Amino acid sequence: MDSRTGENITAHQAENSVFIWEVPNPLYFKIMRVEDPAYTRTRIYHIQVRFNHNLRKALDLHKAFLNFQVWTTSIQASGTTYLNRFRLLVLLYLHRLGVIGINNVIRAVQFATNKSYVNTVLENHDIKYKFY
């Protein structure tokens, strides 16, 4: 859903894509925080994937922040170590695919989190399209 207007995103908007070699450094990965709940063997990584300016311009987006909560049983991996693995797998999937868009990035995250140590992935996205 477009967070500015409240309208649903159409299938055309969600599948709109650009060749990955046309946009240098298309994604910015940021770890927001890492939680270690008490008395559990889980670690929760809060990861934000941001589309850079050139990619937003090519897809007619005003703002695109994809927020993921990754619940894992991986106690050994620090936040930066997990973020590097996550980033590598997402970009590997997108480079193999050759195109990048909103749905393709979400599919790449599903590919990156399809591991035995990942329990759950929660998504909360902030997407705004240009009016004009």
UniProtKB/Swiss-Prot annotation:
Keywords: Host-virus interaction. InterPro entries: Gemini_AL3. It comes from the Viruses. GO terms for biological process: viral process. Pfam families: Gemini_AL3. The keyword NADP does not apply. Homooligomer. Interacts with the replication-associated protein (REP). Interacts with host proliferating cell nuclear antigen (PCNA). Interacts with host retinoblastoma-related protein 1 (RBR1), and may thereby deregulate the host cell cycle. Oligomerization and interaction with PCNA are necessary for optimal replication enhancement. Belongs to the geminiviridae replication enhancer protein family. Increases viral DNA accumulation. Enhances infectivity and symptom expression. This is Replication enhancer protein. It comes from Bean golden yellow mosaic virus (isolate Puerto Rico-Japan) (BGYMV).
